[in-house]
Amino acid sequence: MVGRRLSGERGAASVELAVTFPVVLLLVMTLIQVALWFHARSIALGAAQEGAREGRVQPASTARAETAAEGFLDQTASDLLTGRDVAVAGSPTSIEVTVTGTSPSLFPGLSGWSVTQSAVGPVERPTP
């Protein structure tokens, strides 16, 4: 009697699907949220590295570093990094660019996850 079902099992598949589907959907959305956060981190790191690369060229300039990082974000971030801010700190020997922002959220009512990435580079100095 392999193909016969017991009368008490009728509709069991529908109940199982109704219970497991929301859990699976939540898991998939959480994985996508994590992927968006990692992508936003990658964009922030790229902007920080671009700013540090531009700012360390002789003559070193924190304004040029900030402009380069902002330009990178304008070209690549669109809506993937919101509330973004670029902070540049320079010393005679190094320059540090920090990019902060928020990744988008897939869950209504919840804010995205915070993103902070920094890049430091030595200031180029001509030597005789």
Predicted features along the sequence, with ranges:
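Short, conserved structural patches
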Residues: V2-G3, T62-P128
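Alpha-helical assembly-interface signal, strongest on the long, hydrophobic N-terminal helix that forms
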Residues: M1-A68
